[in-house]
């Protein structure tokens, strides 16, 4: 028994690396990574020894407390739901909101040092790079099957048929920021080698984000690039800064010139100026629905039925996607302003922590996640729930104080 426990304890670090690697991978790998981590913590005995006091866990300044509370409210919301089948499926999708922070409470502190946290970030960067490379190669192969190369095959939905572009774009933006600030000390190579690796990855992420043509991705990578340029000029890497700026401008110009023909987005209609106005009208109608039941909402299981009826009554479009296209509104429809308050509290607590530690680059990453939630019901899909849950736990760990006063390099 002691041998099994010792062996399991040695597997905790590889399991966490695997979890980071699987964040951007298909759902099967996400589920397997969480299950393996839970089993390893159980076999090692760590699952019986919480590493935080009750005061730390239930601290109102703890953003993970509000994240877990949000899930509990979704569970309570089942009490006034009539569609229990949909509600149970929804709770299953949202399970990582409480499961991942719960497991996080039992991870030994030696596995949450700054050095190891950056290794987990490197695993995430590796995973997203593999996914993007696979999508790009698949798109190029599809494009070459035509008589003349079809550039649309590596644009937007054609590039990511199995992945939602906005989710993939958000993960790529975060990966770009993490790549620039990642010390990469564990690679044990020269500074020039590290610069080359970072430059190649960041340029690759920039190119793929432009190809994805996601509004969230466009804003996110603009923020990421500005942060990178600011730090390059601040460190007086003038030549590298101008080379990077020239690459970004040239990249945007080239892809823009090659993709002038309109193509269809996920709502099944070509890009035009009416999309934004229709979306604003859509939000206005949802707010009217919320006003009818603002405190408790309509219940965790009845959200889809309420929005389906709204689509039918108002005849708004978006016929294939029966959600609010905004996580803050979606949460309010489901469990009222109490749920909205919990979701907002998660971001406010994180923002205060990161601002206090002067981790402004990570604060920008948090803002990009918030932007995703303002344009997508990101906690209604496994891709969004899984990514956000791990991202929040990583941000909490990286912003914790410790005796050695470890700090993030360059941030």
Question: Residue spans of the language-model regions?
Answer:
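Perimembrane helix-loop-helix junctions
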Residues: 42-50, 221-242
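Transmembrane alpha-helices of multi-pass inner-membrane enzymes
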Residues: 36-42, 177, 181, 362-374, ...
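Long extracytoplasmic/lumenal interhelical loops at the membrane interface
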Residues: 270-280, 284, 292, 296-335
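Alpha-helical transmembrane segments of multi-pass inner-membrane proteins
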Residues: 19, 116-150, 162-233, 353, ...
């Amino acid at each position: 028994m002691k041998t099994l426990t010792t062996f399991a304890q040695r597997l905790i670090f590889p399991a966490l690396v695997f979890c980071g690697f699987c964040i951007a991978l298909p759902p099967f790998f996400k589920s397997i990574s969480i299950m393996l981590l839970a089993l390893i913590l159980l076999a090692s005995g760590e699952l019986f020894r919480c590493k935080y006091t009750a005061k730390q866990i239930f601290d109102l300044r703890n953003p993970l407390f509000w994240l877990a509370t949000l899930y509990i409210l979704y569970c309570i919301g089942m009490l006034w739901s009539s569609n229990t089948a949909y509600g149970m499926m929804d709770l299953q999708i949202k399970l990582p909101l409480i499961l991942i922070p719960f497991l996080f409470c039992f991870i030994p502190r030696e596995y949450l040092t700054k050095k190891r946290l950056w290794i987990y970030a490197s695993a995430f960067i590796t995973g997203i790079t593999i996914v993007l490379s696979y999508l790009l190669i698949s798109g190029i192969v599809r494009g070459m099957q035509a008589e003349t190369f079809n550039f649309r095959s590596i644009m937007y939905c054609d590039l990511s048929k199995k992945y939602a572009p906005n989710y993939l774009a958000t993960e790529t933006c975060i990966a770009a920021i993490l790549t620039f600030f990642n010390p990469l000390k564990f690679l044990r190579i020269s500074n020039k080698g590290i610069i080359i690796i970072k430059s190649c990855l960041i340029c690759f992420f920039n190119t793929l984000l432009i190809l994805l043509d996601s509004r969230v991705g466009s804003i996110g990578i603009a923020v990421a690039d500005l942060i990178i340029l600011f730090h390059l000029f601040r460190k007086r890497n003038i030549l590298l800064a101008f080379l990077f700026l020239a690459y970004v401008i040239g990249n945007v110009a080239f892809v823009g010139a090659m993709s002038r023909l309109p193509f269809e987005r996920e709502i099944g209609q070509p890009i035009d100026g009416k999309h934004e106005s229709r979306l604003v009208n859509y939000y206005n109608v949802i707010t009217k629905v919320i006003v009818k039941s603002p405190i408790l909402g309509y219940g965790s299981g009845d959200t889809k039925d309420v929005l389906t009826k709204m689509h039918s009554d108002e005849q708004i479009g978006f016929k294939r996607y029966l959600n609010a296209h905004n996580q803050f509104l979606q949460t309010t429809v489901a469990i009222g302003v109490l749920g909205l308050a919990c979701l907002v509290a998660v971001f406010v607590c994180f923002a205060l922590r990161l601002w206090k530690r002067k981790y402004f680059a990570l604060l920008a990453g948090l803002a990009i996640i918030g932007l995703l939630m303002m344009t997508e019901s990101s906690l209604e899909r496994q891709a969004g729930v899984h990514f956000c849950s791990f991202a929040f736990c990583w941000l909490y760990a990286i912003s914790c104080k410790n005796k050695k006063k470890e700090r993030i390099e360059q941030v």
